[in-house]
Amino acid sequence: MAMKIDGANFHERVETNLHNTFMRGAVAGAQERLHTRRLEAAEELGNWEEWRALGEEIRQHTLENLDYYLMQLSENVAKRGGHVFFAQTAEEANNYIRNVVIQKNAKKIVKSKSMVTEEINLNAVLEAAGCEVIETDLGEYILQVDDHDPPSHIVAPALHKNKEQIRDVFRQKLGYKQTEKPEELALHARKMLRHEYLTADIGITGCNFAIAESGSITLVTNEGNADLVTALPKTQITVMGMERIVPTFEEMEVLVSLLTRSAVGQKLTSYITVLTGPRDEGDVDGPEEFHLVIVDNGRSNILGTEFQPVLQCIRCAACVNVCPVYRHIGGHSYGSIYSGPIGAVLSPLLGGYDDYKELPYASSLCAACTEACPVKIPLHELLLKHRQVIVEREGKAPISEKLAMKAFGLGASSSFLYKLGSKVAPSALTPFTNDDRISKGPGPLKAWTEIREFPAPNKERFRDWFREHQKGGEK
């Protein structure tokens, strides 16, 4: 599994990113802009809650009948001259794609943005096979040029970089001579990429939605790079998660409308591309050969469980853009290509609790993510369910938490210990108290009091106050 992007543990990653003041400022600013645009776009559409309910209904229906629609998709792709491969694991998907590359004697591959190819670590496999792989999405291209810096956001992978940093990367790696103006940076990237499109042997894309009734794939972009990736190379390979499918064009229209408004606050992105198999005889562009790789990689294990709603995700990152935890720690702290609330739910399911057991706790459970989700995934409830699984089934609760709960249980079950504790606590905590607040808690309380106010216990216990008033004191 190549979802993991950093070998450091969760607490080390968080500590590093909490001190990255630029990153935190960039994330906060981006969240504000994207959230505001989303609200404006939703209001303009009208009946937003009805649209959300329809999106949820479409995704739930598709998942409940996923085997049927995948078979229909496969048959229709084959009817139109395409090749379909169902990959149960990342290794199977990578091996199939590598074999196609070897068969075609391909040396250069251009790619449009694809989270699932990041998930299976496809680029590294193809580079090991002797291929040059070029990312053509501008954000992904910037990260690739910058020594394969991992993405920090599902929609805007280079969110953690500013224009000055990008300018410096381009100057160091690409011989860039101009300023940090975004227009000049984009034009330079365009100039560098144009040659790559024209000389590529294979184009690889992701898939926003596959359409079962026609065997088509839908690509949603703002840069037009996916059109060039699919139009110019002779061979096209599309890689999709098995859940990224809709029954018909009608459902696709609904989900695209929800996606573009939720992701970037637009009615539609600049390009909505629908492709159906290889080129027909007489066509002047498009691939001569088309391969569709449908990736499971743990998704089938989620079907039929309490976590199935996470597969409704349309990768809009609306949940990321409202998350207060993501706002402070950024995407790299999650240690996964999937960050934010959706990453905190999905990463343990696909990558396992050993690597991602901390992520469900990286949430205030404020439910802002659930309210923002255009297909109504109950993200905060799924995070809570993860915590339950970690504690009850995996036995992953921290030792400090186990000891604290045992101590509380012991004290709460004994009236003598409870009374003693309530008497002793104010005096015992006096060394840590400042202005009626515990400013530096002992032991496990330290992590809490570093970032939150913790009121000191009152010196007068309620039971003493109550007893005094029962004697006929103040009424």
Curated annotation (Swiss-Prot):
Residues 304-334, 353-382 form the 4Fe-4S ferredoxin-type domain. [4Fe-4S] cluster 1 binds at residues 313, 316, 319, 373. SUPFAM superfamilies: alpha-helical ferredoxin, NagB/RpiA/CoA transferase-like. [4Fe-4S] cluster 2 binds at residues 323, 366, 369. One of its GO terms (molecular function) is 4 iron, 4 sulfur cluster binding. One of its GO terms (biological process) is lactate metabolic process. Signal peptide: none annotated. The keyword Iron-sulfur applies. InterPro entries: 4Fe4S_Fe-S-bd, 4Fe4S_Fe_S_CS, FTHF_cligase-like_sf, Helical_ferredxn, LUD_dom, LutB, LutB/LldF, LutB_C. Keywords: 4Fe-4S, Electron transport, Iron, Iron-sulfur, Metal-binding, Repeat, Transport. Belongs to the LutB/YkgF family. Is involved in L-lactate degradation and allows cells to grow with lactate as the sole carbon source. Has probably a role as an electron transporter during oxidation of L-lactate. This is Lactate utilization protein B. The lineage of its organism: Bacteria, Bacillati, Bacillota, Bacilli, Bacillales.
